[in-house]
Amino acid sequence: MGQKIHPLGFRLGTTQNHCSYWFAQSKKIYSKLVKEDKEIRNCIEKYVQKHTNNPFHYGGIARIEIYRKTDLIRVEIHMGFTDLLTENGGIRFEQLKSNIEKIVNSKNQKLCLILIKIDKPYTEPKVLAEYIALQLENRVVFRKAVKKALELAGNFKNKGGIKIQIAGRLNGIEIARVEWTREGRVPLQTIRAHINYYYYPAKTIYGILGIKVWIYQNDE
């Protein structure tokens, strides 16, 4: 029987990097900083989701990276729809920064919040998984949602590949099943392959559907 491993943890240190860059001098401080990083990410996700104004009702955040130094905390938000925070003179950006400063609550460390715009947000598995989840929650047929997601992601046949898997009570049927589709190559067993992965649960009236997205980017 095959044993499954997380695609990102499997490649950590080779093609994947950590999302938090810092070290702690003791276990007590380490646990405090890990919890603080989690709270910062939750704060950003909830704020963007609350103030989103695009038709898909999500901000397109691909990842959040946190860098810590003795006197500085740098938070980088990689997202596709930066207009959500930068419009109207950046009022929402300053509000978000103020909310994060309340979580950090340190007089000795300065907070630096940076927005990085992604040119092609739908080539990020997190953005694509959230898009599919919102379609399923709005009772769109899962095959139609997956087909549209593949169109948004673009053509991977000549350069990499994409795999999408949905598990649960698809279209409301009583018996749960797993459906998946793939375009191009997705070499999960190759450690040096640059594969991005994300899992996102869709909360429908029939129960939770698990959405998994793998995207292989062949830069050779």
Swiss-Prot record:
Domain KH type-2: 48-119
UniProt KW keywords: Chloroplast, Plastid, Ribonucleoprotein, Ribosomal protein, RNA-binding, rRNA-binding
Annotated localization: Plastid, Chloroplast
Cited SUPFAM superfamilies: Prokaryotic type KH domain (KH-domain type II) (SSF54814), Ribosomal protein S3 C-terminal domain (SSF54821)
Transmembrane residue ranges: none
Family annotation (Gene3D superfamilies): 3.30.300.20, Ribosomal protein S3, C-terminal domain (3.30.1140.32)
CDD domains assigned: KH-II_30S_S3
Predominant location category: plastid
PROSITE patterns the UniProt entry points to: RIBOSOMAL_S3
NCBIfam families (alphabetical): rpsC_bact
Protein name: Small ribosomal subunit protein uS3c
Organism: Psilotum nudum (Whisk fern)
Gene: rps3
